[in-house]
Amino acid sequence: DVMRTGERVPAVTADVTLRDALFEMTDKGLGMTAIVDAANSILGIYTDGDLRRTLDAGADVRTTLIRDVMHTNCKTTHADVLAAEALRILEENKITSLLVSDDDGTLIGALNIHDLFREGLM
């Protein structure tokens, strides 16, 4: 299974600092983190590309809250979507990671283009 689940999925709550979100991104190695609420519902996403833009704008990683710099219109998919369809979404949107949710918008996993490549699915 190419979908990362459980502790392998980078996720933080909206009230953490950018610094804490970066630790989560680094620890999980996906180049992004999901932002979730207390019920694990997806609120947004923050990527390494966003980090470059945020730092370029002069943000302080110790005081900036992730809620102030996250993207709320992130692309998601469902666990029953075929890998080929997930790859189409990634390529069409020029993104490298895709959050996976259930029908209620709860985070259940993440897909990464490099994982799909490693599994020979592209």
Where are these regions (language model features)?
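A short, polar/charged loop-to-alpha-helix boundary motif
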Residues: 50-64, 116-122
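Short hydrophobic beta-strand segments in globular cytosolic domains
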Residues: 9, 42-43, 101, 107-108
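Bateman (tandem CBS) regulatory domains
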Residues: 1-9, 63-74
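Short hydrophobic beta-strand motif reused across regulatory alpha/beta modules
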Residues: 44-49, 96, 108-116
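Conserved active-site beta-strand-loop modules that form the wall/rim of enzyme catalytic pockets
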Residues: 30-33, 43-44
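Short alpha-helical segments enriched in small residues
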Residues: 53, 60-72, 79-83
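The conserved cystathionine-beta-synthase
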Residues: 12-29, 36, 55, 76-95, ...
